[in-house]
Swiss-Prot record:
Active site, UniProt feature: 70, 121
Stated name of the protein: Phospholipase A2
Record localization: Secreted
Cofactor binding note of this UniProt entry: Binds 1 Ca(2+) ion per subunit.
Gene from which this protein is expressed: Pla2g1b
Catalysis: reaction(s): a 1,2-diacyl-sn-glycero-3-phosphocholine + H2O = a 1-acyl-sn-glycero-3-phosphocholine + a fatty acid + H(+); 1,2-ditetradecanoyl-sn-glycero-3-phosphocholine + H2O = 1-tetradecanoyl-sn-glycero-3-phosphocholine + tetradecanoate + H(+); 1,2-dihexadecanoyl-sn-glycero-3-phosphocholine + H2O = 1-hexadecanoyl-sn-glycero-3-phosphocholine + hexadecanoate + H(+); 1-hexadecanoyl-2-(9Z-octadecenoyl)-sn-glycero-3-phosphocholine + H2O = 1-hexadecanoyl-sn-glycero-3-phosphocholine + (9Z)-octadecenoate + H(+)
Amino acid sequence: MKLLLLAALLTAGVTAHSISTRAVWQFRNMIKCTIPGSDPLREYNNYGCYCGLGGSGTPVDDLDRCCQTHDHCYNQAKKLESCKFLIDNPYTNTYSYKCSGNVITCSDKNNDCESFICNCDRQAAICFSKVPYNKEYKDLDTKKHC
């Protein structure tokens, strides 16, 4: 999960900024679908070694492993021909999906890049909902523990 990558994208221009803001907000809403009442940007950003900008070392728990898997999924998405441009990449692209109850369904109208990214975010949101949140790993000193 590269939620803070938004800051890095600000230098890419106004268009990338507005799109990346929507992409981050969209992932946030997907997490809220699987975990109603959560505050994803506050709770999951800077958690463990992988939740937030960057990621290295050994995940500290199952939630951190969800973030590591999400990072790897985005790395795979970037290898797709349809996900290589600034506007069409995992950190800036948006997609269509539905939330019904706690079930997320990615739209079959998404293009290849959008579909891949939607499923990366969907799997991460589902993963987050199935594992415990350990407060001691929030704002972890990654230089020391990762």
